[in-house]
């Protein structure tokens, strides 16, 4: 079983995927940089969690 992510992380990740779909890939490191460019995230931990959620979502869409 995986970890349950907070609603804020899911909502923010899905909004970013909708607005900037072409910027995100299945590479976590690239997604960290993309999240930093397109959104004002206050902490590194939050940025990483959102980037991780986006990475997992993109991998599921491509599978």
UniProtKB/Swiss-Prot annotation:
Q: Which domain of life is it from?
A: Archaea
GO annotations under biological process? translation
Give the PROSITE patterns listed for this entry.
Answer: RIBOSOMAL_S17E
The family database entries (Gene3D superfamilies) matched by this protein are listed as:
Ribosomal protein S17e-like
The UniProt entry's GO CC annotations, sorted and at most eight, read:
cytosol; ribonucleoprotein complex; ribosome
Alphabetized InterPro entries for the sequence? Ribosomal_eS17 (IPR001210), Ribosomal_eS17_CS (IPR018273), Ribosomal_eS17_sf (IPR036401)
Q: Give the GO molecular function terms.
A: structural constituent of ribosome
Q: Which UniProt keywords apply?
A: Ribonucleoprotein, Ribosomal protein
Report the sequence similarity comment from the record.
Answer: Belongs to the eukaryotic ribosomal protein eS17 family.
This protein is called what? Small ribosomal subunit protein eS17
Species of origin: Methanococcus vannielii (strain ATCC 35089 / DSM 1224 / JCM 13029 / OCM 148 / SB)
Quote the gene name from the UniProt entry: rps17e
